[in-house]
């Protein structure tokens, strides 16, 4: 893999330094630009004139597939200087109505003795350099943080034919963008980011589809043919493993009081009919469940197991340790007030009182010039000697 012109700042990959050149505008995702600074051995120490604009990338397709217009908005930054650099961080949060409502509820509940905070998983960055020999499929709404705008680098949405392929990534198959050409790209993912190199065609790997950030390939046909959906052997016996009909309801269906066999009440008859109808409905639901699971398994889409895929080499795969789209937010509690009143009162530490004779000294100068020191509690004795 080529060395990128984008430099990671720090060891935790939370920020990147991007070069700004007059001939190459830099596209940075909205909200991710941290600062612009001057650098270099021959720099003047001042940032040159900066021009900032905006650009929409795959607006309509991203709006339909990611249900987000913000994922397509990028700031275009140009400069007249040669040694300016921009600092970029993946400052993107998962905004959604249900998450906003949850944060509102949490803010109300946090008025008690425990503070509750909701945080998204930590995001990291990964610089990528394209040399024109490999295309990259980048999955996720918020994965493209920055890229240089040149005549070669191009970002396109996933084609509909690739999205509908039987061996594609199923529900994740259409939620990616294709990066082609030559240039530098900055990716962002959740958790830590790692790259896996498959050296030849005999190498393969099974990965959870939700952890895939990007996959390289020589064209879309070659890339999608190398991805096999649900590589595990699925047992159809799992389809018959359905919760049994409630035994209590079955007993109700056979309920009949021997003492009142000749005079069953209307309520008892209603209970029997309701139990029989419930049993019939349950059997129908079980039948539909079995047929649905078996049909799904036979067509390569296992709805009862995690969405794993097998990817064949040779290619490079970039993965993230946390899920990009389905990772639930974590709720953590932190004590912001002591639990008891006793804990709220700090312990009083008594400082030992120093004795007076430990710091009051009496000095006597003799006629021969010698000086003697004597510790006394007070000067009463000395005064009495003199007077």
UniProtKB/Swiss-Prot annotation:
Coiled-coil intervals, chain numbering: none
Keyword tags: Mitochondrion, Transit peptide
One Gene Ontology CC term in the entry: mitochondrial inner membrane
Keyword Lyase applies: no
Main subcellular location: mitochondrion
Subcellular location: Mitochondrion
The keyword Mitochondrion is annotated on this UniProt entry: yes
GO annotation terms (biological process): inner mitochondrial membrane organization
SUPFAM superfamilies membership: TRAP-like
PANTHER family in the cross-refs: ALTERED INHERITANCE OF MITOCHONDRIA PROTEIN 24, MITOCHONDRIAL
Family, similarity comment: Belongs to the AIM24 family.
Protein name: Altered inheritance of mitochondria protein 24, mitochondrial
Name of the gene this protein is made from: AIM24
């Amino acid at each position: 893999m080529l060395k990128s012109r984008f430099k990671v700042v720090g060891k935790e990959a939370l920020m990147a330094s991007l070069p700004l050149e007059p001939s190459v505008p830099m596209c940075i995702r909205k909200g991710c630009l941290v600062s612009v600074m001057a650098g270099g051995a021959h720099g003047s120490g001042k940032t040159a004139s900066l021009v900032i604009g905006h650009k929409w990338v795959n607006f309509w397709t991203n709006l339909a597939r990611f249900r987000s217009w913000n994922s397509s908005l990028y700031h275009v930054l140009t400069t007249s200087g040669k040694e300016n650099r921009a600092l970029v961080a993946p400052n993107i949060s998962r905004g959604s109505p249900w998450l906003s409502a949850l944060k509102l509820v949490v803010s109300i509940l946090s008025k008690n003795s425990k503070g509750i905070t909701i945080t998204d998983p930590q995001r990291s960055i990964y610089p990528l350099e394209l040399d024109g020999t490999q295309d990259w499929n980048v999955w996720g709404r918020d994965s493209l943080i920055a890229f240089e705008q040149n005549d070669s680098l191009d970002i396109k949405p996933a084609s509909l034919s690739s999205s509908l392929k039987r061996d594609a990534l199923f529900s994740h198959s259409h939620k990616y963008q294709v990066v082609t050409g030559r240039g530098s790209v900055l990716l962002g993912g959740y958790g830590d980011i790692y790259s896996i190199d498959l050296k030849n065609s005999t190498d393969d790997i099974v990965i959870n589809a939700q952890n895939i950030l990007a996959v390289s390939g020589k064209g879309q046909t070659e890339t999608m043919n190398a991805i096999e959906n649900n590589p595990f052997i699925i047992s159809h016996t799992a389809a018959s493993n359905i919760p049994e009909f409630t035994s209590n309801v079955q007993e109700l269906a056979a309920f009949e009081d021997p003492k009142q066999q000749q005079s069953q009440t209307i309520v008892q008859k209603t209970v029997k009919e309701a139990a029989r109808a419930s049993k019939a409905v349950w059997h129908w639901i079980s039948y539909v469940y079995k047929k649905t699971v078996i049909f799904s398994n036979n067509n390569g889409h296992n709805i009862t197991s995690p969405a794993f895929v097998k990817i064949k080499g040779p290619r490079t795969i970039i993965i993230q340790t946390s899920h990009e789209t389905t990772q639930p937010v974590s709720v953590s509690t932190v004590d912001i007030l002591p639990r008891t009143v006793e804990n709220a009162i700090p312990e009083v530490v008594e400082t030992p009182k120093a004795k007076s004779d430990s710091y009051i000294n009496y000095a006597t100068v003799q006629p021969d010039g010698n000086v003697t020191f004597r510790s006394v509690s007070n000067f009463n004795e000395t005064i009495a000697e003199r007077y």
